[in-house]
Protein backbone atom coordinates (compact mmCIF):
# COMPACT_ATOMS: atom_id res chain seq x y z
CA UNK A 1 0.00 0.00 0.00
CA UNK A 2 1.34 3.48 -0.81
CA UNK A 3 2.26 5.66 2.15
CA UNK A 4 2.48 9.41 2.53
CA UNK A 5 5.58 9.96 0.35
CA UNK A 6 4.08 7.97 -2.54
CA UNK A 7 0.73 9.79 -2.25
CA UNK A 8 2.47 13.18 -2.25
CA UNK A 9 4.56 12.29 -5.29
CA UNK A 10 1.39 11.24 -7.10
CA UNK A 11 -0.16 14.60 -6.24
CA UNK A 12 2.96 16.36 -7.55
CA UNK A 13 2.55 14.63 -10.92
CA UNK A 14 -1.09 15.67 -11.13
CA UNK A 15 -0.20 19.26 -10.25
CA UNK A 16 2.57 19.35 -12.85
CA UNK A 17 0.10 18.26 -15.52
CA UNK A 18 -2.71 20.76 -15.02
CA UNK A 19 -2.03 23.26 -12.22
CA UNK A 20 -2.71 26.87 -13.19
CA UNK A 21 -4.17 26.09 -16.61
CA UNK A 22 -7.85 26.73 -17.47
CA UNK A 23 -9.94 23.57 -17.40
CA UNK A 24 -11.47 22.95 -20.82
CA UNK A 25 -13.40 19.82 -19.86
CA UNK A 26 -14.64 18.58 -16.50
CA UNK A 27 -16.48 15.28 -16.21
CA UNK A 28 -17.79 13.28 -13.24
CA UNK A 29 -19.32 9.81 -13.38
CA UNK A 30 -21.49 10.28 -10.30
CA UNK A 31 -24.80 12.05 -11.05
CA UNK A 32 -24.68 14.11 -7.84
CA UNK A 33 -21.41 15.70 -9.00
CA UNK A 34 -22.38 16.36 -12.61
CA UNK A 35 -24.00 19.76 -11.86
CA UNK A 36 -20.49 21.03 -11.05
CA UNK A 37 -19.11 20.19 -14.50
CA UNK A 38 -20.15 23.46 -16.13
CA UNK A 39 -19.28 25.52 -13.05
CA UNK A 40 -15.71 24.19 -12.88
CA UNK A 41 -15.00 24.45 -16.61
CA UNK A 42 -12.82 27.51 -17.17
CA UNK A 43 -11.52 27.48 -13.60
CA UNK A 44 -7.96 26.48 -12.68
CA UNK A 45 -6.56 23.95 -10.25
CA UNK A 46 -4.63 26.09 -7.76
CA UNK A 47 -2.99 23.25 -5.83
CA UNK A 48 -3.48 19.65 -4.71
CA UNK A 49 -3.07 18.92 -1.01
CA UNK A 50 -2.70 15.54 0.68
CA UNK A 51 -4.01 14.40 4.03
CA UNK A 52 -2.81 10.85 4.48
CA UNK A 53 -4.32 9.00 1.52
CA UNK A 54 -6.89 11.68 0.70
CA UNK A 55 -6.28 14.18 -2.10
CA UNK A 56 -7.79 17.66 -2.02
CA UNK A 57 -7.83 19.29 -5.46
CA UNK A 58 -8.48 23.00 -4.95
CA UNK A 59 -10.11 25.09 -7.70
CA UNK A 60 -9.75 28.81 -8.29
CA UNK A 61 -13.45 29.37 -7.65
CA UNK A 62 -13.17 28.14 -4.07
CA UNK A 63 -14.50 24.59 -4.37
CA UNK A 64 -12.44 21.47 -3.62
CA UNK A 65 -12.56 17.98 -5.10
CA UNK A 66 -12.13 15.46 -2.26
CA UNK A 67 -11.00 11.99 -3.31
CA UNK A 68 -9.79 8.97 -1.37
CA UNK A 69 -8.33 6.13 -3.40
CA UNK A 70 -9.15 3.48 -0.78
CA UNK A 71 -7.98 0.10 -2.13
CA UNK A 72 -8.60 0.44 -5.84
CA UNK A 73 -8.58 4.09 -6.89
CA UNK A 74 -5.80 5.31 -9.16
CA UNK A 75 -5.00 8.59 -10.94
CA UNK A 76 -3.51 8.79 -14.45
CA UNK A 77 -2.01 11.68 -16.43
CA UNK A 78 -2.67 11.62 -20.18
CA UNK A 79 -2.59 14.01 -23.13
CA UNK A 80 -5.75 16.03 -23.65
CA UNK A 81 -8.43 14.07 -25.48
CA UNK A 82 -6.81 10.69 -24.87
CA UNK A 83 -9.02 7.94 -23.46
CA UNK A 84 -6.71 5.06 -22.48
CA UNK A 85 -7.92 1.50 -22.74
CA UNK A 86 -8.54 0.26 -19.22
CA UNK A 87 -10.57 -2.32 -17.35
CA UNK A 88 -11.04 0.26 -14.61
CA UNK A 89 -14.11 2.48 -14.38
CA UNK A 90 -13.46 6.17 -15.02
CA UNK A 91 -14.80 8.40 -12.23
CA UNK A 92 -13.29 11.87 -12.85
CA UNK A 93 -11.74 13.71 -15.78
CA UNK A 94 -10.13 17.15 -15.39
CA UNK A 95 -8.71 18.39 -18.69
CA UNK A 96 -6.78 21.44 -19.87
CA UNK A 97 -5.74 22.33 -23.42
CA UNK A 98 -2.73 20.02 -23.21
CA UNK A 99 -3.18 17.45 -20.42
CA UNK A 100 -5.86 15.59 -18.50
CA UNK A 101 -5.87 13.83 -15.15
CA UNK A 102 -8.16 10.83 -14.80
CA UNK A 103 -9.36 9.12 -11.62
CA UNK A 104 -10.36 5.47 -11.96
CA UNK A 105 -12.24 3.09 -9.67
CA UNK A 106 -12.43 5.30 -6.55
CA UNK A 107 -15.84 5.64 -4.92
CA UNK A 108 -15.16 8.17 -2.15
CA UNK A 109 -15.38 11.39 -4.19
CA UNK A 110 -17.11 14.69 -3.42
CA UNK A 111 -17.12 18.39 -4.22
CA UNK A 112 -16.83 20.51 -1.08
CA UNK A 113 -16.96 24.14 -0.04
CA UNK A 114 -14.23 25.46 2.26
CA UNK A 115 -16.57 25.05 5.23
CA UNK A 116 -17.35 21.46 4.24
CA UNK A 117 -13.63 20.68 3.93
CA UNK A 118 -13.11 21.99 7.45
CA UNK A 119 -15.89 19.75 8.75
CA UNK A 120 -15.38 16.64 6.62
CA UNK A 121 -15.61 13.51 8.83
CA UNK A 122 -12.45 11.84 7.46
CA UNK A 123 -10.40 15.04 7.54
CA UNK A 124 -11.51 15.71 11.11
CA UNK A 125 -10.32 12.24 12.14
CA UNK A 126 -6.84 12.34 10.64
CA UNK A 127 -3.94 14.07 12.31
CA UNK A 128 -1.50 16.52 10.74
CA UNK A 129 0.33 15.17 7.69
CA UNK A 130 4.02 14.32 8.12
CA UNK A 131 4.72 15.95 4.75
CA UNK A 132 3.16 19.25 5.82
CA UNK A 133 6.36 21.29 5.99
CA UNK A 134 4.84 23.63 8.58
CA UNK A 135 4.56 20.74 11.05
CA UNK A 136 7.44 20.85 13.56
CA UNK A 137 9.13 18.26 15.76
CA UNK A 138 7.96 20.24 18.80
CA UNK A 139 4.34 19.83 17.71
CA UNK A 140 4.88 16.11 17.10
CA UNK A 141 6.43 15.74 20.56
CA UNK A 142 3.38 17.44 22.08
CA UNK A 143 1.12 14.94 20.29
CA UNK A 144 3.23 12.04 21.56
CA UNK A 145 2.78 13.29 25.13
CA UNK A 146 -0.92 14.10 24.81
CA UNK A 147 -3.40 12.15 26.92
CA UNK A 148 -4.83 10.60 23.76
CA UNK A 149 -1.55 9.06 22.55
CA UNK A 150 1.01 8.86 25.38
CA UNK A 151 0.00 5.37 26.55
CA UNK A 152 -0.38 3.78 23.11
CA UNK A 153 2.18 1.20 21.95
CA UNK A 154 4.14 2.51 18.99
CA UNK A 155 3.31 -0.58 16.91
CA UNK A 156 -0.29 0.61 16.67
CA UNK A 157 0.17 4.33 17.17
CA UNK A 158 2.39 4.78 14.13
CA UNK A 159 -0.27 3.18 11.92
CA UNK A 160 -3.07 5.34 13.33
CA UNK A 161 -3.82 8.19 10.92
CA UNK A 162 -5.44 10.08 13.79
CA UNK A 163 -1.96 10.48 15.30
CA UNK A 164 -0.07 11.51 12.17
CA UNK A 165 -1.36 11.17 8.63
CA UNK A 166 0.88 9.66 5.98
CA UNK A 167 2.65 7.00 8.03
CA UNK A 168 2.40 3.33 7.10
CA UNK A 169 4.18 0.05 7.66
CA UNK A 170 7.58 0.65 6.05
CA UNK A 171 7.83 4.07 7.68
CA UNK A 172 6.75 2.62 11.04
CA UNK A 173 9.54 0.04 11.17
CA UNK A 174 12.24 2.34 9.77
CA UNK A 175 11.43 5.15 12.21
CA UNK A 176 11.52 2.82 15.22
CA UNK A 177 14.82 1.28 14.09
CA UNK A 178 16.30 4.74 13.62
CA UNK A 179 15.63 5.66 17.26
CA UNK A 180 16.34 2.19 18.71
CA UNK A 181 12.87 1.55 20.09
CA UNK A 182 10.73 -1.58 20.00
CA UNK A 183 7.14 -1.51 18.81
CA UNK A 184 5.88 -2.25 22.32
CA UNK A 185 7.22 0.95 23.87
CA UNK A 186 5.05 3.97 24.68
CA UNK A 187 5.76 7.69 24.72
CA UNK A 188 4.96 7.85 28.44
CA UNK A 189 7.98 5.60 29.13
CA UNK A 190 10.56 7.61 27.21
CA UNK A 191 13.17 10.07 28.38
CA UNK A 192 13.10 13.60 27.04
CA UNK A 193 16.01 12.90 24.70
CA UNK A 194 14.28 9.77 23.36
CA UNK A 195 11.12 11.77 22.76
CA UNK A 196 13.08 14.43 20.89
CA UNK A 197 14.78 11.82 18.71
CA UNK A 198 11.48 10.10 17.92
CA UNK A 199 9.68 13.36 17.13
CA UNK A 200 12.40 14.32 14.66
CA UNK A 201 12.50 10.86 13.06
CA UNK A 202 8.73 10.89 12.58
CA UNK A 203 9.21 13.85 10.23
CA UNK A 204 12.72 13.36 8.87
CA UNK A 205 12.34 9.83 7.50
CA UNK A 206 9.05 10.38 5.60
CA UNK A 207 10.41 13.64 4.19
CA UNK A 208 13.64 11.99 3.08
CA UNK A 209 11.63 9.25 1.41
CA UNK A 210 9.55 11.87 -0.40
CA UNK A 211 12.53 13.95 -1.54
CA UNK A 212 14.57 11.05 -2.86
CA UNK A 213 11.83 9.52 -5.00
CA UNK A 214 12.36 5.97 -3.74
CA UNK A 215 10.31 2.91 -4.62
CA UNK A 216 8.59 0.89 -1.91
CA UNK A 217 9.67 -2.49 -3.28
CA UNK A 218 13.28 -1.48 -3.83
CA UNK A 219 15.78 -2.14 -1.04
CA UNK A 220 17.57 1.05 -2.09
CA UNK A 221 14.38 2.89 -1.29
CA UNK A 222 16.09 6.16 -0.56
CA UNK A 223 18.80 5.87 -3.18
CA UNK A 224 22.31 6.74 -2.08
CA UNK A 225 20.98 8.81 0.83
CA UNK A 226 19.12 6.12 2.70
CA UNK A 227 18.58 2.39 2.57
CA UNK A 228 15.97 0.29 4.27
CA UNK A 229 17.56 -0.75 7.54
CA UNK A 230 15.02 -3.40 8.56
CA UNK A 231 12.04 -3.41 6.17
CA UNK A 232 11.95 -6.75 4.29
CA UNK A 233 15.42 -7.55 5.67
CA UNK A 234 14.54 -10.31 8.14
CA UNK A 235 17.37 -12.80 8.56
CA UNK A 236 20.03 -10.24 7.65
CA UNK A 237 22.47 -8.63 10.05
CA UNK A 238 21.65 -5.26 11.56
CA UNK A 239 24.17 -2.69 10.36
CA UNK A 240 24.14 -0.95 13.73
CA UNK A 241 24.72 -3.81 16.18
CA UNK A 242 25.30 -6.93 14.08
CA UNK A 243 22.24 -8.69 15.47
CA UNK A 244 19.81 -10.59 13.27
CA UNK A 245 16.78 -8.69 12.01
CA UNK A 246 13.55 -10.47 12.83
CA UNK A 247 10.04 -10.40 11.41
CA UNK A 248 6.96 -10.71 13.57
CA UNK A 249 3.39 -9.38 13.52
CA UNK A 250 2.36 -6.32 15.52
CA UNK A 251 -0.99 -4.57 15.16
CA UNK A 252 -1.93 -7.13 12.48
CA UNK A 253 0.90 -6.02 10.16
CA UNK A 254 4.36 -7.47 9.45
CA UNK A 255 6.89 -5.87 11.77
CA UNK A 256 10.64 -5.88 11.13
CA UNK A 257 13.08 -5.05 13.90
CA UNK A 258 16.42 -5.81 15.53
CA UNK A 259 16.06 -7.24 19.05
CA UNK A 260 19.73 -6.49 19.61
CA UNK A 261 19.43 -2.71 19.55
CA UNK A 262 15.71 -1.86 19.68
CA UNK A 263 14.52 -1.84 23.26
Curated annotation (Swiss-Prot):
What ranges of residues constitute the FPG-type zinc fingers? 229-263
Supply the EC number(s): 3.2.2.-, 4.2.99.18
SUPFAM superfamilies linked to this entry = Glucocorticoid receptor-like (DNA-binding domain), N-terminal domain of MutM-like DNA repair proteins, S13-like H2TH domain
Reactions mediated catalytically: 2'-deoxyribonucleotide-(2'-deoxyribose 5'-phosphate)-2'-deoxyribonucleotide-DNA = a 3'-end 2'-deoxyribonucleotide-(2,3-dehydro-2,3-deoxyribose 5'-phosphate)-DNA + a 5'-end 5'-phospho-2'-deoxyribonucleoside-DNA + H(+)
The cofactor named in the record is: Zn(2+)
Task: Provide the active-site residues from the annotation.
Answer: 2 (schiff-base intermediate with dna), 3 (proton donor), 53 (proton donor), 253 (proton donor)
Keyword Cytoplasm included in the entry's annotation:
no
Tagged with keyword Phosphoprotein: no
Alphabetically, the GO molecular function entries are: class I DNA-(apurinic or apyrimidinic site) endonuclease activity; damaged DNA binding; oxidized pyrimidine nucleobase lesion DNA N-glycosylase activity; zinc ion binding
Please provide the Gene Ontology terms (biological process) for this protein.
Answer: base-excision repair
Gene3D superfamilies the UniProt entry points to: 1.10.8.50, MutM-like, N-terminal
Q: Which InterPro entries match?
A: DNA_glyclase/AP_lyase_DNA-bd, DNA_glyclase_Znf_dom_DNA_BS, EcNei-like_N, Endonuclease-VIII, FPG_cat, MutM-like_N-ter, Ribosomal_uS13-like_H2TH, Znf_DNA_glyclase/AP_lyase
**What are the protein's UniProt keywords?**
DNA damage, DNA repair, DNA-binding, Glycosidase, Hydrolase, Lyase, Metal-binding, Multifunctional enzyme, Zinc, Zinc-finger
- Its biological function? Involved in base excision repair of DNA damaged by oxidation or by mutagenic agents. Acts as a DNA glycosylase that recognizes and removes damaged bases. Has a preference for oxidized pyrimidines, such as thymine glycol, 5,6-dihydrouracil and 5,6-dihydrothymine. Has AP (apurinic/apyrimidinic) lyase activity and introduces nicks in the DNA strand. Cleaves the DNA backbone by beta-delta elimination to generate a single-strand break at the site of the removed base with both 3'- and 5'-phosphates.
Q: Which family does it belong to?
A: Belongs to the FPG family.
Name recorded for this polypeptide = Endonuclease 8
Organism expressing this protein natively: Klebsiella pneumoniae subsp. pneumoniae (strain ATCC 700721 / MGH 78578)
UniProt lineage: Bacteria, Pseudomonadati, Pseudomonadota, Gammaproteobacteria, Enterobacterales
Amino acid sequence: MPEGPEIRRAADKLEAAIKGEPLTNVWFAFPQLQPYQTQLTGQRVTHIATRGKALLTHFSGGLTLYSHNQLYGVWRVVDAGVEPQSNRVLRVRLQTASKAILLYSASDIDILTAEQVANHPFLLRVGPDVLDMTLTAEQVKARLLSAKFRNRQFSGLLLDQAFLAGLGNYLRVEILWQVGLSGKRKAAELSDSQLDALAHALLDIPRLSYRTRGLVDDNKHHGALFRFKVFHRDGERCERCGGIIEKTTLSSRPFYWCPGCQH
